[in-house]
Regions:
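Residue-level detector of conserved, function-critical positions
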Residues: 21-336
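Bacterial N-terminal signal peptides that target proteins for export
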Residues: 1-9
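Bacterial N-terminal signal peptides
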Residues: 9-17
Length: 336
Protein backbone atom coordinates (compact mmCIF):
# COMPACT_ATOMS: atom_id res chain seq x y z
CA UNK A 1 0.00 0.00 0.00
CA UNK A 2 1.41 3.32 -1.01
CA UNK A 3 1.81 5.74 1.87
CA UNK A 4 2.96 9.31 2.15
CA UNK A 5 6.49 10.10 3.26
CA UNK A 6 5.29 11.06 6.75
CA UNK A 7 3.76 7.62 7.28
CA UNK A 8 7.12 5.98 6.68
CA UNK A 9 8.98 8.46 8.85
CA UNK A 10 6.50 8.13 11.67
CA UNK A 11 6.49 4.34 11.64
CA UNK A 12 10.22 3.86 11.36
CA UNK A 13 11.58 6.62 13.56
CA UNK A 14 9.06 8.40 15.73
CA UNK A 15 7.75 5.35 17.52
CA UNK A 16 11.21 4.05 18.35
CA UNK A 17 12.35 7.48 19.49
CA UNK A 18 9.31 8.01 21.66
CA UNK A 19 9.75 4.63 23.33
CA UNK A 20 12.99 5.76 24.93
CA UNK A 21 12.79 9.55 25.15
CA UNK A 22 10.69 12.06 27.01
CA UNK A 23 9.53 15.34 25.55
CA UNK A 24 12.19 17.10 27.61
CA UNK A 25 15.06 15.13 26.12
CA UNK A 26 14.06 14.75 22.47
CA UNK A 27 16.34 16.47 19.99
CA UNK A 28 15.10 17.49 16.57
CA UNK A 29 17.16 17.40 13.35
CA UNK A 30 17.31 20.70 11.44
CA UNK A 31 19.06 21.83 8.29
CA UNK A 32 20.85 25.15 7.84
CA UNK A 33 22.66 25.99 4.65
CA UNK A 34 22.59 22.37 3.57
CA UNK A 35 24.11 21.08 6.81
CA UNK A 36 22.24 19.19 9.50
CA UNK A 37 22.31 19.65 13.27
CA UNK A 38 19.94 19.36 16.25
CA UNK A 39 17.79 21.67 18.36
CA UNK A 40 15.82 21.33 21.58
CA UNK A 41 12.04 21.78 21.71
CA UNK A 42 12.72 25.44 22.58
CA UNK A 43 14.51 25.91 19.25
CA UNK A 44 17.89 26.23 20.96
CA UNK A 45 20.71 24.71 18.94
CA UNK A 46 22.33 21.80 20.78
CA UNK A 47 24.46 20.28 18.03
CA UNK A 48 25.68 22.72 15.41
CA UNK A 49 24.79 21.98 11.78
CA UNK A 50 27.70 19.95 10.43
CA UNK A 51 26.35 16.72 8.97
CA UNK A 52 25.37 15.76 5.43
CA UNK A 53 22.21 14.27 6.89
CA UNK A 54 20.83 13.63 10.38
CA UNK A 55 17.98 11.48 11.66
CA UNK A 56 15.98 11.26 14.88
CA UNK A 57 17.50 9.92 18.07
CA UNK A 58 16.54 6.47 19.32
CA UNK A 59 17.93 4.90 22.49
CA UNK A 60 20.36 7.78 22.92
CA UNK A 61 21.99 7.64 19.50
CA UNK A 62 21.17 9.14 16.10
CA UNK A 63 22.34 8.08 12.63
CA UNK A 64 24.24 10.88 10.89
CA UNK A 65 25.98 10.98 7.53
CA UNK A 66 29.45 12.45 7.16
CA UNK A 67 30.33 10.96 3.81
CA UNK A 68 29.36 7.63 5.32
CA UNK A 69 26.95 6.85 8.13
CA UNK A 70 27.82 6.74 11.81
CA UNK A 71 26.13 7.68 15.09
CA UNK A 72 26.31 10.62 17.50
CA UNK A 73 25.16 10.95 21.09
CA UNK A 74 23.00 13.76 22.45
CA UNK A 75 26.03 16.00 23.01
CA UNK A 76 27.05 15.74 19.36
CA UNK A 77 30.01 13.50 20.13
CA UNK A 78 30.65 10.83 17.53
CA UNK A 79 29.80 7.59 19.32
CA UNK A 80 30.28 5.26 16.35
CA UNK A 81 32.61 6.39 13.58
CA UNK A 82 31.18 6.92 10.09
CA UNK A 83 31.84 3.66 8.26
CA UNK A 84 28.50 2.34 7.00
CA UNK A 85 26.67 2.73 3.71
CA UNK A 86 23.35 2.66 5.55
CA UNK A 87 22.52 2.90 9.23
CA UNK A 88 19.21 2.22 10.92
CA UNK A 89 17.83 3.46 14.22
CA UNK A 90 18.67 1.52 17.36
CA UNK A 91 15.87 -0.68 18.62
CA UNK A 92 16.11 -3.03 21.59
CA UNK A 93 19.82 -2.32 21.84
CA UNK A 94 20.76 -3.19 18.25
CA UNK A 95 20.87 -1.35 14.93
CA UNK A 96 20.97 -2.76 11.42
CA UNK A 97 23.82 -1.37 9.32
CA UNK A 98 24.88 -2.03 5.76
CA UNK A 99 28.32 -2.35 4.24
CA UNK A 100 28.53 -2.08 0.46
CA UNK A 101 25.89 -1.02 -2.03
CA UNK A 102 25.90 2.67 -1.07
CA UNK A 103 22.71 4.71 -0.88
CA UNK A 104 21.83 7.96 0.87
CA UNK A 105 18.95 6.71 3.01
CA UNK A 106 19.51 5.88 6.68
CA UNK A 107 17.02 3.03 6.65
CA UNK A 108 15.51 1.13 3.79
CA UNK A 109 13.97 -2.11 5.02
CA UNK A 110 12.91 -3.21 1.57
CA UNK A 111 15.68 -1.59 -0.44
CA UNK A 112 17.64 -3.04 -3.31
CA UNK A 113 21.30 -3.03 -4.22
CA UNK A 114 24.53 -4.74 -3.22
CA UNK A 115 26.13 -5.07 0.17
CA UNK A 116 25.11 -6.92 3.29
CA UNK A 117 23.38 -6.03 6.56
CA UNK A 118 24.44 -6.93 10.05
CA UNK A 119 23.66 -5.62 13.54
CA UNK A 120 25.78 -3.54 15.89
CA UNK A 121 25.48 -2.63 19.57
CA UNK A 122 25.76 0.94 20.96
CA UNK A 123 29.55 0.56 21.14
CA UNK A 124 29.64 -0.02 17.40
CA UNK A 125 30.66 -3.67 17.71
CA UNK A 126 29.05 -6.29 15.52
CA UNK A 127 26.73 -8.60 17.40
CA UNK A 128 25.50 -10.15 14.16
CA UNK A 129 28.01 -10.02 11.30
CA UNK A 130 26.98 -8.59 7.90
CA UNK A 131 25.41 -11.46 5.98
CA UNK A 132 21.87 -10.45 5.05
CA UNK A 133 20.57 -9.01 1.80
CA UNK A 134 18.19 -6.84 3.80
CA UNK A 135 17.25 -6.38 7.44
CA UNK A 136 14.60 -4.74 9.60
CA UNK A 137 14.45 -3.43 13.15
CA UNK A 138 14.22 -5.60 16.24
CA UNK A 139 10.80 -5.77 17.86
CA UNK A 140 9.79 -8.23 20.54
CA UNK A 141 13.25 -9.76 20.41
CA UNK A 142 13.14 -10.62 16.71
CA UNK A 143 14.08 -8.97 13.42
CA UNK A 144 13.07 -9.78 9.86
CA UNK A 145 16.03 -10.55 7.59
CA UNK A 146 16.33 -11.46 3.94
CA UNK A 147 18.58 -14.26 2.71
CA UNK A 148 18.61 -15.98 -0.66
CA UNK A 149 15.60 -14.04 -1.84
CA UNK A 150 13.36 -14.91 1.10
CA UNK A 151 12.56 -13.39 4.47
CA UNK A 152 12.82 -15.04 7.86
CA UNK A 153 13.48 -13.93 11.44
CA UNK A 154 16.50 -13.93 13.75
CA UNK A 155 16.93 -13.40 17.48
CA UNK A 156 19.41 -10.98 19.05
CA UNK A 157 22.27 -13.46 18.80
CA UNK A 158 21.76 -13.76 15.05
CA UNK A 159 20.26 -17.23 15.32
CA UNK A 160 17.61 -17.95 12.71
CA UNK A 161 14.41 -18.67 14.62
CA UNK A 162 12.04 -18.68 11.63
CA UNK A 163 13.58 -20.00 8.44
CA UNK A 164 13.67 -17.70 5.40
CA UNK A 165 10.58 -18.70 3.45
CA UNK A 166 8.50 -15.57 3.00
CA UNK A 167 8.28 -13.25 0.01
CA UNK A 168 7.93 -10.30 2.38
CA UNK A 169 7.91 -9.76 6.13
CA UNK A 170 7.24 -6.93 8.57
CA UNK A 171 8.39 -6.44 12.15
CA UNK A 172 6.58 -8.15 15.00
CA UNK A 173 3.85 -6.06 16.57
CA UNK A 174 1.74 -7.31 19.46
CA UNK A 175 3.39 -10.74 19.10
CA UNK A 176 2.45 -11.22 15.45
CA UNK A 177 4.23 -10.35 12.21
CA UNK A 178 2.68 -9.83 8.79
CA UNK A 179 4.30 -12.10 6.21
CA UNK A 180 3.72 -12.87 2.54
CA UNK A 181 3.65 -16.45 1.33
CA UNK A 182 2.57 -17.74 -2.09
CA UNK A 183 1.24 -14.34 -3.06
CA UNK A 184 -0.90 -13.69 0.01
CA UNK A 185 -0.36 -12.09 3.40
CA UNK A 186 -1.02 -13.67 6.77
CA UNK A 187 0.47 -13.49 10.26
CA UNK A 188 3.07 -15.64 11.97
CA UNK A 189 3.76 -15.96 15.68
CA UNK A 190 7.24 -16.07 17.20
CA UNK A 191 7.47 -19.85 16.81
CA UNK A 192 6.94 -19.61 13.07
CA UNK A 193 3.41 -20.98 13.24
CA UNK A 194 0.89 -19.21 11.05
CA UNK A 195 -1.53 -17.64 13.50
CA UNK A 196 -3.62 -16.24 10.63
CA UNK A 197 -3.30 -18.11 7.35
CA UNK A 198 -2.14 -16.21 4.24
CA UNK A 199 -5.30 -14.97 2.58
CA UNK A 200 -5.00 -11.20 2.21
CA UNK A 201 -3.79 -9.03 -0.67
CA UNK A 202 -2.08 -6.68 1.81
CA UNK A 203 -1.65 -6.64 5.58
CA UNK A 204 -0.51 -4.11 8.17
CA UNK A 205 0.99 -4.58 11.65
CA UNK A 206 -1.34 -5.00 14.60
CA UNK A 207 -2.09 -1.96 16.72
CA UNK A 208 -4.47 -1.94 19.67
CA UNK A 209 -5.52 -5.48 18.82
CA UNK A 210 -6.52 -4.77 15.24
CA UNK A 211 -4.74 -4.89 11.89
CA UNK A 212 -5.70 -3.47 8.52
CA UNK A 213 -6.02 -6.09 5.77
CA UNK A 214 -7.02 -5.84 2.12
CA UNK A 215 -9.18 -8.36 0.34
CA UNK A 216 -11.12 -7.94 -2.88
CA UNK A 217 -9.45 -4.56 -3.36
CA UNK A 218 -10.93 -3.14 -0.14
CA UNK A 219 -9.48 -2.67 3.33
CA UNK A 220 -11.01 -3.78 6.61
CA UNK A 221 -9.69 -4.92 9.99
CA UNK A 222 -9.14 -8.27 11.70
CA UNK A 223 -8.40 -9.22 15.29
CA UNK A 224 -5.60 -11.55 16.38
CA UNK A 225 -7.71 -14.64 15.78
CA UNK A 226 -8.15 -13.57 12.16
CA UNK A 227 -11.80 -12.69 12.67
CA UNK A 228 -13.01 -9.79 10.55
CA UNK A 229 -14.12 -7.08 12.96
CA UNK A 230 -14.61 -4.29 10.41
CA UNK A 231 -15.74 -5.43 6.98
CA UNK A 232 -13.57 -4.56 3.97
CA UNK A 233 -15.02 -1.31 2.65
CA UNK A 234 -12.22 1.25 2.58
CA UNK A 235 -9.83 2.27 -0.18
CA UNK A 236 -6.98 2.66 2.29
CA UNK A 237 -6.41 2.57 6.05
CA UNK A 238 -3.89 3.42 8.74
CA UNK A 239 -3.31 2.03 12.22
CA UNK A 240 -5.40 2.56 15.33
CA UNK A 241 -3.92 4.97 17.87
CA UNK A 242 -5.93 5.58 21.04
CA UNK A 243 -9.07 4.26 19.44
CA UNK A 244 -8.95 6.11 16.13
CA UNK A 245 -7.69 4.98 12.72
CA UNK A 246 -7.48 7.01 9.50
CA UNK A 247 -9.40 5.49 6.58
CA UNK A 248 -10.12 6.55 3.02
CA UNK A 249 -13.56 6.11 1.53
CA UNK A 250 -14.92 7.56 -1.71
CA UNK A 251 -11.73 9.55 -2.22
CA UNK A 252 -11.61 11.22 1.18
CA UNK A 253 -10.03 10.44 4.54
CA UNK A 254 -11.68 10.40 7.94
CA UNK A 255 -11.30 8.51 11.21
CA UNK A 256 -13.15 5.49 12.57
CA UNK A 257 -13.41 3.85 15.99
CA UNK A 258 -12.80 0.10 16.59
CA UNK A 259 -16.41 -0.69 15.66
CA UNK A 260 -15.91 0.84 12.22
CA UNK A 261 -18.05 3.87 12.95
CA UNK A 262 -16.88 7.23 11.62
CA UNK A 263 -15.93 9.54 14.48
CA UNK A 264 -14.51 12.15 12.10
CA UNK A 265 -16.27 12.15 8.75
CA UNK A 266 -14.32 11.47 5.57
CA UNK A 267 -13.47 14.97 4.36
CA UNK A 268 -9.69 15.21 3.97
CA UNK A 269 -7.48 14.67 0.94
CA UNK A 270 -5.07 12.74 3.13
CA UNK A 271 -4.68 11.91 6.82
CA UNK A 272 -2.24 10.23 9.20
CA UNK A 273 -2.52 8.56 12.59
CA UNK A 274 -2.85 10.56 15.79
CA UNK A 275 0.18 11.36 17.92
CA UNK A 276 0.24 13.51 21.05
CA UNK A 277 -3.48 14.16 20.56
CA UNK A 278 -3.18 15.65 17.07
CA UNK A 279 -3.18 14.23 13.56
CA UNK A 280 -1.89 15.70 10.27
CA UNK A 281 -4.54 16.14 7.59
CA UNK A 282 -4.39 17.60 4.10
CA UNK A 283 -7.17 19.81 2.82
CA UNK A 284 -7.24 21.96 -0.31
CA UNK A 285 -3.61 21.18 -1.00
CA UNK A 286 -2.22 22.12 2.40
CA UNK A 287 -1.58 20.33 5.67
CA UNK A 288 -2.92 21.17 9.11
CA UNK A 289 -3.82 19.27 12.28
CA UNK A 290 -7.05 18.03 13.85
CA UNK A 291 -7.87 16.92 17.38
CA UNK A 292 -9.82 13.70 18.16
CA UNK A 293 -13.13 15.53 17.80
CA UNK A 294 -12.23 16.47 14.23
CA UNK A 295 -11.71 20.15 15.00
CA UNK A 296 -8.98 21.85 12.99
CA UNK A 297 -6.71 23.19 15.72
CA UNK A 298 -3.93 24.15 13.29
CA UNK A 299 -5.28 25.42 10.00
CA UNK A 300 -4.05 23.86 6.75
CA UNK A 301 -1.06 25.95 5.67
CA UNK A 302 1.94 23.64 5.22
CA UNK A 303 3.31 21.91 2.14
CA UNK A 304 4.04 18.81 4.21
CA UNK A 305 3.46 17.83 7.83
CA UNK A 306 4.52 14.99 10.10
CA UNK A 307 2.93 13.64 13.29
CA UNK A 308 4.01 15.23 16.55
CA UNK A 309 7.06 13.81 18.31
CA UNK A 310 6.97 15.02 21.88
CA UNK A 311 6.05 18.71 21.79
CA UNK A 312 6.93 19.47 18.17
CA UNK A 313 5.94 18.45 14.66
CA UNK A 314 8.13 18.71 11.61
CA UNK A 315 6.59 20.63 8.71
CA UNK A 316 7.72 21.92 5.36
CA UNK A 317 6.82 25.36 4.06
CA UNK A 318 8.23 27.00 0.97
CA UNK A 319 10.51 24.04 0.45
CA UNK A 320 12.15 24.47 3.88
CA UNK A 321 11.89 22.33 7.00
CA UNK A 322 10.64 23.80 10.26
CA UNK A 323 9.07 22.73 13.57
CA UNK A 324 5.83 23.87 15.16
CA UNK A 325 4.34 23.39 18.61
CA UNK A 326 0.80 22.25 19.41
CA UNK A 327 -0.55 25.78 18.96
CA UNK A 328 0.84 25.92 15.43
CA UNK A 329 3.55 28.42 16.31
CA UNK A 330 6.96 27.97 14.71
CA UNK A 331 9.68 27.02 17.19
CA UNK A 332 12.17 26.54 14.37
CA UNK A 333 11.27 28.73 11.43
CA UNK A 334 11.65 27.34 7.89
CA UNK A 335 13.25 30.67 6.90
CA UNK A 336 16.38 29.80 8.89
Amino acid sequence: MKKSWFYLWFTLTTLSAMSVCTAATILYPVVVGGRWGYVRKSGETVINPQFDRAEMFAEGLAPVRMGRWGYVDATGKVAINPQFDKAEDFSEGLAAVKLGGGGPAPFNPFGIGGGHYGYINPEGKYVVNPQFDDAGTFAGGFAAVKMGGHWGFIDKTGKIVINPQFDDAAAFSENLAAVKLAGHFGYTDASGKMAINPQFEKAQPFSEGLAGVRTGGKWGFVDKSGKVTINPQFDDVGSFVKGLAPVRQSGHWGYIDPTGKFVINAQFDEAAAFSEGLAPVRQSGHWGYVDPSGKLVINPQFDEAMPFTGDLARVKSGGRIGYINASGKFVWNPAK
